[in-house]
Swiss-Prot record:
The protein's name in its UniProt record: NADH-quinone oxidoreductase subunit B
Molecular-function GO terms, alphabetical: 4 iron, 4 sulfur cluster binding; iron ion binding; NADH dehydrogenase (ubiquinone) activity; NADH:ubiquinone reductase (non-electrogenic) activity; quinone binding
HAMAP family registered for this protein in UniProt: NDH1_NuoB (MF_01356)
Protein family (similarity comment): Belongs to the complex I 20 kDa subunit family.
Organism listed in the record: Rickettsia africae (strain ESF-5)
Function of the molecule: NDH-1 shuttles electrons from NADH, via FMN and iron-sulfur (Fe-S) centers, to quinones in the respiratory chain. The immediate electron acceptor for the enzyme in this species is believed to be ubiquinone. Couples the redox reaction to proton translocation (for every two electrons transferred, four hydrogen ions are translocated across the cytoplasmic membrane), and thus conserves the redox energy in a proton gradient.
GO cellular component: plasma membrane; respiratory chain complex I
Subunit organization: NDH-1 is composed of 14 different subunits. Subunits NuoB, C, D, E, F, and G constitute the peripheral sector of the complex.
Membrane topology of this protein: Peripheral membrane protein
Gene name for this UniProt entry: nuoB
Length: 174
C-alpha cells in the first residue's frame, strides 16, 4: 500500500506531464507548505523525551517530513509536550506557548502529558497539559514508541492541510 504523500506526488507529476501547468487554490498551497515545514520545539519533561529523541535520530528521521527542531519558541510553530507536567512547570509551559509564533500547534506525547499518567493522583501533577495549553494531537503510550510519535505528527500534518486561510482558526486558544 502506497503512502498518501507518494500518491500526491504521482498525481502532481501526472498533471504536470499531461498539461504542463497546475491549477490549485492558494489555501491548499498554504496548507501544504505549513504541513511540510513544521519546526517543533521540544518540551521534554520525562522519559517520553528519550523516545522523541529517538524519532529524530537516523532510524526514523523526522527531517524527511520537513521537521527541524528549533531551540527557541519564537522560531517554532509546534510544541511537543513529552512527559509529566508538574504544577511548578505549568506557568513555564504556558509562557513558552505564548512566545510561539502563529499559527501554532501542540502535540501531547505520553500518558503523563495526556492525563497525568502514573502520577495522576499526586498533588504536584497537572492532570493533562490540555488544562494549560490547547492540544491538537494526543499520542498515547507509556512511553509511546517513536513510530507512534511519527504517526501523531502525520495526523497533525493532515489536520494542518485541512485548515484554510492565512489565519489558523480551527480552534479557540485559552
Amino acid at each position: 500500500m502506497k503512502n498518501n504523500f507518494y500518491q500526491e506526488d504521482e498525481l502532481l507529476s501526472n498533471e504536470l506531464s499531461n498539461r504542463g501547468f497546475l491549477l490549485t487554490k492558494v489555501d491548499d498551497v498554504i496548507g501544504w507548505a505549513r504541513a511540510n515545514s513544521l519546526w517543533p520545539m521540544t518540551f521534554g519533561l520525562a522519559c517520553c523525551a528519550v523516545e522523541m529523541m529517538q524519532a529524530a535520530a537516523s532510524r526514523y528521521d523526522m527531517d524527511r517530513f520537513g521537521m527541524l527542531f528549533r531551540p527557541s519558541p519564537r522560531q517554532s510553530d509546534l510544541m511537543i509536550v513529552a512527559g509529566t507536567l508538574t504544577n511548578k512547570m505549568a506557568p513555564a509551559l504556558r509562557k513558552v506557548y505564548d512566545q510561539m509564533t502563529e499559527p501554532k500547534w501542540v502535540l501531547s506525547m505520553g500518558s503523563c502529558a495526556n492525563g497525568g499518567g502514573y502520577y495522576h493522583f499526586s498533588y504536584s501533577v497537572v492532570r493533562g497539559c490540555d488544562r494549560i495549553v490547547p492540544v491538537d494531537v494526543y499520542v498515547p503510550g507509556c512511553p509511546p514508541t517513536a513510530e507512534a510519535l511519527i504517526y501523531g505528527l502525520m495526523q497533525l500534518q493532515k489536520k494542518i492541510k485541512r485548515t484554510t486561510g492565512f489565519k489558523y482558526d480551527a480552534r479557540q486558544t485559552h
